[in-house]
Swiss-Prot record:
NCBIfam families cross-referenced by the UniProt entry: TRAP_S1
Protein name: Solute-binding protein Dde_0634
Cleaved signal peptide residues: 1-29
CDD domains tied to this protein: PBP2_TRAP_Dctp3_4
Species this chain originates from: Oleidesulfovibrio alaskensis (strain ATCC BAA-1058 / DSM 17464 / G20) (Desulfovibrio alaskensis)
Pfam families, per database record: DctP (PF03480)
Keyword Transport: yes
Keyword Transport: yes
Subunit relationships: The complex is comprised of an extracytoplasmic solute-binding protein and a heteromeric permease formed by two transmembrane proteins.
Function of the molecule: Solute-binding protein that binds indole-3-pyruvate and indole-3-acetate (in vitro). Can also bind D-tryptophan (in vitro), but that is probably not a physiological ligand. Probably part of a tripartite ATP-independent periplasmic (TRAP) transport system that mediates solute transport into the cytoplasm.
Length: 340
């Protein structure tokens, strides 16, 4: 009787342990799902980057991680993206630093007209600057990668052939680019990019000051028939992750995500540089958009006009305990390394 009872106990124990093993294996095989929120339309470069990054994560983790993407403000909008990721409404989000004035005193150096002519160089320098400095302003989130827009130009309803034509013109800009517009005599109007097409169509603004990919991606070629080349500042972006969501990931998955950071900064810039050229060809050929170049004396005047913005940034950074001279030296060294 005792031997029969013992045999039953062994059998039950084997069944239970087998069930537990199967359950743990099933749990281990279950992919982690991450929500990635973005605010501009799906056709724009931050969302193209999002989809490419999600694909790479799925592939390189061999299915351990799935990424659900939410473009066009379907999960979080531009104004609440930072807060939403920090509170866990989304695991991952893309933020435009320009939409958060005063929050990023060090990294907002990238809103200044630093002289970049390529998004690839600007994006790589931005990521290297962050990686080297790790400023406290971003320590509450995990930064997965950073990248920039292409250099900013004027897209306007009426032609801008000189700085005189800009005087008093209502132009959309964000962050420091609004301040650049003001220094040049325009009337800056700040609003998230998804609101801009309607504002142009209603005549609330007469144009925008940003990179030329939106001529095609957001169909501004139909609304603004003129482009004035200015090669002004870029817009910096950061892909951020909720800290608790990051810490829940296994070390091997964290390693994959970290390995994508510099690679994706360069990939996004490279994609954008090619796409800007494509967008402008399309805008000129299909919509007859006219391209204007400012006179040399106006270009020199622009450089002089924006110098106070560098001084103001340096003061804000110093007030937050940063060394603005060291930051600018690092930017200059990295810019020389990666080219303009």
């Amino acid at each position: 009787m005792k031997s029969t009872f013992a045999a039953l106990l062994i059998m039950v124990g084997c069944l239970v342990s087998g069930a537990l093993l199967t359950g743990s294996e099933a749990a281990a095989a279950q992919p982690v799902t991450l929500n990635y929120a973005n605010f501009p339309p799906a056709s724009t470069f931050p969302c193209i980057q999002m989809e490419q990054w999600a694909h790479e994560v799925r592939t390189r983790t061999r299915g351990k991680v799935d990424v659900l993407t939410y473009p066009g403000g379907t999960l979080l909008g531009a104004r609440n993206m930072l807060r939403g990721v920090m509170s866990g409404q989304a695991d991952i989000g893309c933020i435009s630093l320009a939409y958060h004035p005063g929050v990023f005193p060090v990294m907002s150096v990238f809103e200044l007209p630093l002289g970049f002519t390529s998004a690839e160089a600007a994006s790589s320098v931005l990521w290297e600057l962050y990686s080297g400095l790790r400023p406290a302003e971003l320590e509450r989130v995990k930064v997965l990668t950073m990248f920039t827009s292409a250099p900013s130009h004027f897209m306007t309803v009426t032609p801008v052939r000189s700085l005189r034509d800009l005087q008093g013109m209502e132009i959309r800009g964000a962050g420091t680019l609004s301040a650049i517009l003001e220094k040049l005599g325009a009337t800056p109007v700040s609003m998230p990019m998804p609101e801009v097409p309607e504002a142009v169509q209603k005549g609330i603004i007469k144009g925008l000051f940003t990179s030329l990919d939106v001529m095609k991606d957001m169909n501004f070629a139909e609304m603004t028939g003129h482009v004035t080349r200015a090669d002004q500042a870029v817009y910096p972006f950061a892909v951020i992750m909720n800290r608790e969501a990051w810490e829940r990931l296994s070390p091997d998955v964290q390693q994959v995500l970290d390995g994508l950071a510099a690679e994706h900064a360069a990939w996004t810039g490279r994609y954008l540089d090619a796409h800007v050229q494509d967008s402008m060809r399309w805008a000129e050929e299909k919509h007859g958009v006219q391209v204007h170049t400012l006179p040399e004396e106006d270009i020199a005047a622009m450089r002089r006009s924006v110098q106070p913005l560098f001084d103001a940034w340096a003061q804000r950074a110093a007030d937050k305990g940063a060394d603005p001279d060291a930051v600018m030296r690092t930017v200059d060294a990295l810019k020389a390394q990666y080219g303009g």
